[in-house]
Design a protein with these regions (language model features):
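Positively charged n-region of N-terminal signal peptides that target proteins for export
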Residues: 1-7
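Bacterial N-terminal signal peptides
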Residues: 7-17
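Solvent-exposed, acidic/flexible segments
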Residues: 35-46, 101-104, 151-158, 190-194, ...
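N-terminal small/glycine-rich loop or linker at the start of catalytic domains
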Residues: 128-149, 230, 235-240
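Catalytic domains of carbohydrate-active enzymes, especially glycoside hydrolases
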Residues: 156-178
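C-terminal non-catalytic alpha-helical accessory regions
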Residues: 423-428, 444-587
Length: 587
């Protein structure tokens, strides 16, 4: 044992953290012991641990025989719901104890994150202690549409990503079957998509997570009957003309048939809840439905909620207040006060209409209005982490908005029991993880950023990469250059970055230079991981675009092409496809 290692162990012991001295050295083989009669979820946790280690270093896990390191997984109640304990194992090694299956997966994640993978093998972490989540609603929403990553990537890749998120303590996956992409339930493309969605949700269940469904109040297929369609003028945000009017008797029948088929399809996964959504992309502007949020939409909430509970007994109904105005919110709360059985909770995020919700805004200042959400219903957040001040979404690589996330959380956490960040892809991976730790124990964003960098790249580069993350967030803004529209297909002729002027982007060249130096220090596995590549390419693009007057050169286009491959965005619509020029080919 070298002097540096000995000093570290002495410091840990003096701090009250007791460790097995043998754990300070890297190993290439280890043995995993699972409980007798381990459940399928526990067995899967072991498999996920093995995958994580083998992807990051040249080491492997065995379940029999001799090994240099013993890792034991057990479940023992008494720690606290979904909590865990990591301790030394009698006879040597590490013992990961979960209060339950979710506690075990979270504890496994903590052990993996505090270990090292860059010293010629696996160096087990020395963190010891107990951790219990302070909030039970710790989820993520995948926007499974527009041919984004969740819509197009190989299913196994997405399943692994779900497992990655579970290791950070997330316990629920919410998805949306966006019907406007298809023509009917038996549309071959719809059948294929539902199979894919089911496999993704099944992966969440296998790792101990719940699943939930998001539905539009007046959901419709792309070929909905013209005579049943909604009147224009009732939508806010995204809107498609195929939406159906629920005030027409046949329109409500159409909606319930569509959603009933969906509930039957998902019933075997036992969805924990159904979220019913008002705007973006629902709505109807007819006299019987206006104002949509408090009138037509509430008809849908009653009938769709009743159907969901009938088809999937035990499921909870959550009402979304997304894009409702203050008058609509007040009316909805009054109706919920009169009908206590209508819903089981609310989905609300103060960054949409902070003055209306009373939950605060994203500028770190609490909302000054008296809260309108007054019916003693649990409220979960829905922070938007994908689209803020950028276009195309994820078009320039990683978008770490960790300081903004801290501001969102500070302003709204007192009114929330947890939340579900809104995700359009993997480019905001770091921001997702920051939110996972807000929900777990209110850990500050800066601490989570350090933990993420140490785990995904190396503990030795934490300070350098954390500084780059700050620079990237500081220089996060819309971009535009002449001719950008050529070859970029858009829906609804929408291009929010149009005519944006180049900005100063201070520190962009230095950040890229730092990333180049760090790249040379990383293991082969770390430097070729998608998490590193998207962060590296973002720094490259910021630097190149700054020095090139804001317009892309061939170096930028090569970066765009690589991002398209990482995100499987070859068929994505222009809002989420990196802006590679039409017919560009590498020289």
């Amino acid at each position: 044992m070298n002097m540096r290692t000995l000093n570290l162990l002495c410091l840990l012991i003096l701090s009250g953290v007791v460790v097995d001295p043998s754990l300070a050295e890297a190993v290439n083989t280890m043995r995993l012991n699972l409980p007798e009669n381990a459940s399928p979820v526990v067995k899967n946790i072991g498999q996920v641990m093995a995958r994580q280690i083998q992807e990051r270093c040249d080491a492997k896990i065995e379940t029999t025989g001799e090994a240099k390191l013993m890792i034991e997984m057990v479940i023992e109640q008494g720690i606290g719901k979904e909590g865990f304990r990591i301790e030394d194992r009698k006879g040597g090694g590490v013992r990961i104890v979960g209060n339950d299956e979710r506690g075990l997966v979270a504890g496994t994640g903590k052990f993996l994150r505090t270990s090292r993978y860059d010293r010629g093998g696996f160096t087990p972490g020395t963190w010891r202690g107990i951790s219990i989540p302070t909030r039970q609603a710790r989820g993520i929403y995948f926007a499974t549409h527009f041919h984004n990553f969740y819509h197009e990537a190989p299913v196994e890749e997405i399943q692994h990503y779900v497992e990655d998120l579970a290791l950070w303590g997330l316990n629920e996956l919410v998805v949306w079957y966006d019907a406007h992409h298809f023509n009917e339930f038996e549309d071959p493309e719809a059948v294929k998509f539902r199979k894919r969605l089911h496999e993704i949700m099944a992966a969440a269940r296998r790792i101990g997570m719940d699943v939930s469904l998001l539905v539009i109040g007046n959901e419709a297929y792309g070929n909905s009957p013209a005579d049943l369609r909604s009147a224009p003028g009732g939508g806010r945000g995204g809107y498609y003309p195929c939406a159906v009017c629920p005030s027409k008797p046949e329109g409500m029948k159409y909606i319930l048939k569509l959603l009933g088929e969906q509930f039957d399809w998902a019933a075997d996964l036992k969805p924990r809840s159904v979220w019913i959504w008002p705007y973006d992309q629902g709505g109807c502007g007819c006299a019987k439905c206006k104002p949509w949020g408090s009138k037509g939409f509430m008809k849908c909430v009653e009938e769709v909620g009743k159907l969901a509970r009938q088809k999937m007994p035990g499921t909870k109904i959550l009402l979304s207040t997304w894009l409702m105005d203050k008058a609509e919110l007040a009316s909805v709360m009054e109706q919920l006060g009169e009908r206590k059985d209508l819903v089981d909770g609310l989905v609300n995020e103060g960054n949409v209409l902070p003055a209306a919700s009373g939950l605060g805004s994203v500028d770190q200042k609490p909302g000054d209005a008296a809260p309108v959400l007054t019916q003693d219903l649990p409220v979960v957040g829905f922070p938007e982490i994908s689209m803020h001040n950028t276009f195309p979404w994820g078009g320039f690589g990683a978008t770490p908005l960790t300081a903004r996330a801290q501001g969102q959380w500070n302003a709204q956490k007192k009114g929330l029991i947890g939340g579900y960040p809104y995700s359009e892809g993997i480019y905001e991976d770091l921001t997702k993880i920051v939110y996972s730790q807000f929900y777990w124990n209110d850990q500050p964003a800066e601490e989570t950023v350090k933990e993420y960098i140490a785990y995904e790249f190396s503990p030795d580069v934490v300070a350098d990469v954390a500084a780059v993350v700050k620079t990237l967030e500081q220089n996060h803004h819309m971009r535009w250059w002449p001719g950008k529209l050529e070859g970029v297909p858009l829906e609804m002729n929408w291009f929010p970055s149009k005519n944006t002027k180049p900005q100063a982007d201070p520190g962009a060249e230095e950040a890229y230079a730092t990333m180049q130096k760090v790249d040379a220090r990383l293991t082969h596995q770390a430097k070729n991981s998608w998490r590193w590549r998207q962060l590296y390419l973002r720094a490259l693009l910021d630097s190149e675009l700054k020095t090139n007057g804001g317009s892309p050169n061939d170096t930028c286009n090569e970066a765009f092409a690589e991002l398209i491959r990482i995100y499987h965005a070859e068929n994505a619509i222009g809002t989420i496809r990196p802006p590679l020029p039409k017919n560009w080919k590498k020289k």
